[in-house]
A protein has these predicted regions:
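N-terminal acidic, glycine/proline-rich low-complexity segments
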Residues: 7-313
Length: 313
C-alpha cells in the first residue's frame, strides 16, 4: 500500500536492544481461540505489505487460513499482471517462513467495472468456501491491505456470506473531529466500486483502519537492519525489498531511512485490540447511512515493540 503523506516518527536502537531475544515464530502468548483470518494484499505494490504479512504469520493470536493476492492499477509503474506479481511474492513469503500449507489463491487482475458486476477469481471462490464453513454465530475475519475487489466479488457472487464476515479495510482518510471522509486514497482509488459496496451493504460488519490513523506507524531502516539484516530467510528478504524498491513518488528521504507501515498497523490492531482505539461513526454522506467502526488512534510504541519481539533472535 502506498501513500503520499508521511509522518516522521523517531525510534531508537535502544528500544530494540532491551527486548528479550526470541527466535522467529516462537509462541510466547498462546491463545485458545486465535482470530480466524484471511489476508488479502496487493503485496507487490509496495513494501509495508510484506512486513505486515510476515509479522502476521508469526502471531499466535492470528489464525491465518488464507493469503490472497490483489491487483492495483493507479500506480504509473503498475505491471500488466499486477495480481500475478502479488501472487508471486505471497508464495515466496509463505515458502521462506515454512507456511506453504496455507492456501494462497490468486485474485482478480482488474477492478470492478460497476457496483453490481463481480470479478470472479480463485480468491473470491476461496473466500466464499471459507465463509460458508463458519459455524452459526461466528465470523470469518478478512484483512484487506489493498483494493477490496476480491472480497466484494465474493459477496456479490454469494450474498449468503454477508452475516458470516467481519471485513477490516485499510483505506480512506478520515477526520475524527469533523466526521468527514476522503476517498482520495490509494487503496480506495484502486477499486472505488468495491469500496462503495462495502459501505452500502446493510448488516455487513465493516471496520476501517484509515490512512489518517495508520500513517503514524513509521519504521526506521537502522532498526530494521539490526533486527533483520544478515539473518537469512525472511529477514534478508524483507530488507532486500526495502532497499531495492523504488519509492519514486516521494520527494524527501531519498535514502529511504524511514518507511510508513500502514499495513502492519491494521494487523497489529486486529491481533491486539488494546493497542488501538475504535469508534463507531457514520458512513460517508454519499453512501448508505449506517454506522461502521473506525480505528481512530494506535499505540505506535506498543505496535513497534510487538514487531521487534516477533522477529528478535
Amino acid at each position: 500500500m502506498k501513500r503520499r503523506k508521511f509522518l516522521t516518527h523517531t525510534t531508537t536502537l535502544a528500544t530494540l536492544t532491551i527486548l528479550d531475544p526470541l527466535k522467529f515464530g516462537v509462541v510466547t502468548d498462546p491463545v485458545v481461540h486465535p482470530l480466524r483470518l484471511i489476508i488479502d494484499a496487493d503485496t507487490a505494490n509496495e513494501v509495508d505489505d510484506l512486513y505486515a504479512i510476515a509479522r502476521a504469520l508469526l502471531e499466535p493470536r492470528l489464525g491465518i487460513v488464507g493469503l490472497t493476492s490483489a491487483q492495483w492499477h493507479t500506480n504509473p509503474r503498475t505491471p500488466n499482471d499486477s495480481v500475478g506479481e502479488s501472487q508471486r511474492i505471497n508464495e515466496e513469503i509463505l515458502k521462506l517462513m515454512g507456511k506453504s500449507a496455507i492456501p494462497a489463491p490468486q485474485g482478480a487482475n482488474f477492478p470492478m467495472v460497476n457496483e453490481q458486476r463481480p470479478q470472479p477469481s480463485e480468491a473470491a471462490t476461496f473466500i466464499i468456501e471459507q465463509a460458508m464453513r463458519i459455524p452459526e454465530g461466528e465470523k470469518l475475519s478478512i484483512a484487506i491491505l489493498g483494493p477490496a475487489t476480491n472480497i466484494v466479488s465474493a459477496i456479490l457472487l454469494e450474498p449468503k456470506i454477508i452475516p458470516k464476515l467481519s471485513v477490516n479495510y485499510l483505506g480512506f482518510w478520515y477526520n475524527v473531529a469533523t466526521n468527514t471522509w476522503s476517498k482520495r486514497e490509494f487503496n480506495t482509488n484502486n477499486d472505488p466500486n468495491a469500496v462503495n459496496v462495502l459501505l452500502n451493504t446493510p448488516n455487513l460488519e465493516f471496520r476501517v483502519m484509515t490512512a489518517t490513523t495508520s500513517q503514524h506507524l513509521v519504521f526506521e531502516k537502522t532498526v530494521m537492519d539490526q533486527l533483520l539484516k544478515g539473518k537469512g530467510g525472511i529477514g534478508d528478504y524483507l530488507i532486500n525489498r526495502w532497499e531495492t524498491y523504488d519509492r519514486f513518488w516521494k520527494e524527501t528521504d531519498k535514502e529511504k531511512t524511514k518507511w510508513t507501515m500502514w499495513d502492519v498497523a491494521i494487523l497489529e490492531a486486529l491481533a491486539y485490540p488494546e493497542l488501538a482505539e475504535e469508534k463507531e461513526v457514520m458512513t460517508p454522506h454519499d453512501n448508505l447511512a449506517r454506522t461502521i467502526k473506525v480505528f481512530t488512534k494506535i499505540d505506535v510504541a506498543g505496535m513497534k515493540a510487538n514487531f521487534y519481539k516477533a522477529f528478535s533472535r
